[in-house]
A protein has these predicted regions:
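Flexible helix-coil transition and linker loops at the boundaries of alpha-helical arrays
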Residues: 21, 55-65
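Structural register within alpha-helical repeat arrays
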Residues: 73-74
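Bacterial Sec signal peptide processing site at the extreme N-terminus
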Residues: 11-34
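Helix-turn-helix repeat elements of alpha-solenoid scaffolds
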Residues: 40-53
């Protein structure tokens, strides 16, 4: 009986150590965004855009898709950087992937196209 109890305790202890994989991979998103917002230099803007692109291209979370708002944020930043068509296409991808954002993103697109 004592051996059975120890076996159950050991199995439950080992199984509780398993960590779950996050839904989305964020890589260095927070740091890149913070650094750019802190000092808005062209070099930091390029680094931030590279980080966003990496996040979009190499998504390794359990869902396997880009986090909500990422396409729109990347698209908006591209639009501000002068890559208007590419920026608008990413804003539209946000609507495709997350239809619940359509009202909000459509307003942003409408404002940008004025």
């Amino acid at each position: 009986m004592k051996k059975l109890f120890l076996a159950i305790v050991a199995v439950s202890a080992l199984s509780s150590c398993n960590t779950t994989q996050p839904l989305y991979s964020w890589y260095n998103y927070e740091d890149a965004t913070y650094q750019y917002k802190k000092k808005s230099t062209e070099e930091l803007h390029v680094k931030m855009l590279e980080q966003y692109q990496k996040l979009i291209e190499k998504q390794k979370g359990t869902r396997g898709v880009v986090p909500p708002g990422m396409y729109s944020e990347y698209g908006y930043e591209l639009y501000k950087a002068g890559k208007k068509e590419k920026g608008l296409s990413f804003l539209k991808k946000e609507i495709t992937l997350y239809p619940e954002s359509e009202k909000y993103i459509s307003r942003i697109i409408k404002q940008l196209e004025k």
